[in-house]
């Protein structure tokens, strides 16, 4: 079974996916949204990769160096054993600055014996467009593509460079290194320098993980998902949905999208999760990104580029075969043109936490207040209109219940912020508007025929997003309507241990895969309505659906439990953390002994 058995490494500038046999099959340089250098993930023949060739007698196992994002792949045979430690340098270089170069180290550590290997270095820059040439110099191997001759990469190594290019077999007799850099290095690189980079990066990750709150159960699960979320954050505070593009929701279908952008919804949920377990710095950086990006215009979008870009035009790369033959391969995402009324609810919930717990300086508070007013003017003007919803349908807009609920959240949180700042007129106005939304949802969203809230005002379909009505405070768990909705959603959408997000037809047909995050939403919903044992059993089952490193993509196959969709996905990992916290915090409460 192909379970997306990749590890991820990165440094908040870019990231790489490395297979369970140590082959780099996805890497964009110099940034997350740059063209790929290796894209075998999307085309085995053309995409390019960077790996190690060993005989069939070698056993290979992979794990993370504990508490870090340094990936270890160990090759073992009778003749010898070696370990490849993959990482991207990431550490504080000055008092307030971090060193985040566009480069990747492969530290080859000799464990025992005299293992034999060959380096398979096959870059294919610019999404494998153009002819590739490798030029060997005394210092490095230079990669150049005919598609853009100014875009180059440099491979440094303690191994003979001609042996690398010619893929000759090498007998490992000591520790060696490979360094792939987007820039030509200004200082000489040797094994001692590499070890310094390794130690600095190791210390950085250990310190970062140490700031994550600790729990008596599921701590390892929480920690790994938090490390993934950190890798999905750009250094300016933007948060990516995933580091990949065009991994299909279902193999062979066309629901293939580029996720290397910052959605307000996804990012707000991710940052709130990071803040909840102790990472205040990530929240502050995101708030600065939001202020600088959204304050530039009142023409709000649901998503932006990682540097705040507004135009994210979608095109296809028709020369690539696609993951497992699933075409098209897309870059860019036309969803940026959509109206999704729910997005600002998630953002306003986070901004409310900002005001409560990390308000910053007076000028920052005032700048944020101006943004709050603009957002809520937008929400007030648009909540009555149809939209594309949380699932970004590409057909006609609808009056989605979850969108109305999140508009209520936006106005409710805005009213609370206004009350905190003693802006009583705004508080009263926004409370009244929020109450109007509540009445509207209760009148048009609840359907007696199905004894549940429905997906939209105009249908009787069920939708997993209805489960969010309780955690965002629209309706209490004790309300019979919420309990009935949870049970109705489970009956309609829970299938073979997993959840559909919805199962009515959309503009691409009927969804055929499970949405990973939605199963975690169901677990939480079952927990809050009192079905604790069922919730915990289902949670433990879901954890087994991760790959060999505990990483999750966006989707799962109902029958095989094979992962699909972009990977690793922020939605899935924030849901892992939030669900694990239900049980971890309960366990800690029960284990607390008063003196």
Describe every region a protein language model picked out.
Residues 1-595:
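Acidic, mature catalytic/reactive cores of soluble proteins
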């Amino acid at each position: 079974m192909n379970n997306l058995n990749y590890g991820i490494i990165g440094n908040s500038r870019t990231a790489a996916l490395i297979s369970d046999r140590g082959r780099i099959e996805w890497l964009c340089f110099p940034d997350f949204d740059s063209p790929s250098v290796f894209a075998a993930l999307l085309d085995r023949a053309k995409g390019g990769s960077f790996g190690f060739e060993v005989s069939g007698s070698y056993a290979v196992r992979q794990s993370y160096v504990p508490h870090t994002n340094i990936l270890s792949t160990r090759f073992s045979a009778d003749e010898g054993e070696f370990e490849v430690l993959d990482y991207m340098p990431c550490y504080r270089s000055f008092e307030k600055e971090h060193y985040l170069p566009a480069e990747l180290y492969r530290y080859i550590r000799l464990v025992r014996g005299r293992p034999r290997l060959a380096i398979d270095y096959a870059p294919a820059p610019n999404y494998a467009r153009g002819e590739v040439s490798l030029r060997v110099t005394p210092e490095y191997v230079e990669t150049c593509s005919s598609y853009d001759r100014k875009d180059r990469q440099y491979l440094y190594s303690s191994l003979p460079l001609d042996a690398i290019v010619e893929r000759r077999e090498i007998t490992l007799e000591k520790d060696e290194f490979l360094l792939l850099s987007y820039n030509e290095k200004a200082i000489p690189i040797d094994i001692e320098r590499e070890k310094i980079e390794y130690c600095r990066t190791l210390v950085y990750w250990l310190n970062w993980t140490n700031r994550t709150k600790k729990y008596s159960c599921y701590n390892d699960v929480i920690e790994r998902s938090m490390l993934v979320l950190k890798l999905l954050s750009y250094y300016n505070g933007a948060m990516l949905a995933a580091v990949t593009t065009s991994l299909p929701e279902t193999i062979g279908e066309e629901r293939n999208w580029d996720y290397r952008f910052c959605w307000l919804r996804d990012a707000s949920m991710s940052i709130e999760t990071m803040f909840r377990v102790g990472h205040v710095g990530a929240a502050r950086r995101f708030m600065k990104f939001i202020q600088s990006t959204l304050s530039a215009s009142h023409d709000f979008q649901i998503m932006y580029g990682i540097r705040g870009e507004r135009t994210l035009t979608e095109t296809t790369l028709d020369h690539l075969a696609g993951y497992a033959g699933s075409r098209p391969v897309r870059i860019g995402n036309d969803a940026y043109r959509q109206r999704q009324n729910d997005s600002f609810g998630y953002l306003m919930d986070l901004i409310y936490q900002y005001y409560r717990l990390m308000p910053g300086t007076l000028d920052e508070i005032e700048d944020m207040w101006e943004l709050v007013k603009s957002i809520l003017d937008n929400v007030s003007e648009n909540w009555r209109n149809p939209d594309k919803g949380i699932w970004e349908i590409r057909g006609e807009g609808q009056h989605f219940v979850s969108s109305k609920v999140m508009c209520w959240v936006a106005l409710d949180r805005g009213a609370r912020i206004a009350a905190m700042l003693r802006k009583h007129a705004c508080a009263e106005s926004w409370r009244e508007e929020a109450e109007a939304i509540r009445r509207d949802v209760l009148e048009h969203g609840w359907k007696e025929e199905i004894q549940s809230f429905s997906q939209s005002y105009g249908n009787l379909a069920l939708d997993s997003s209805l489960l969010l009505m309780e955690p965002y405070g629209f309706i209490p768990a004790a309300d019979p309507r919420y309990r009935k909705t949870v049970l109705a959603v489970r009956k309609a959408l829970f299938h073979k241990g997993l959840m559909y997000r919805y199962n009515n037809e959309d503009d691409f047909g009927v969804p055929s895969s499970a949405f990973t995050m939605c199963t975690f939403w169901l677990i939480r919903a079952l927990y809050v309505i009192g079905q604790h044992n069922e919730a915990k059993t289902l949670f433990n089952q879901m954890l087994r659906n991760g790959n060999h490193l505990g990483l999750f993509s966006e989707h799962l196959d109902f029958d095989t439990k094979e992962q699909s969709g972009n990977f690793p996905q922020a939605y899935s990992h924030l849901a892992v953390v939030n669900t694990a916290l239900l049980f971890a915090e309960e366990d800690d409460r029960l284990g607390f002994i008063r003196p």
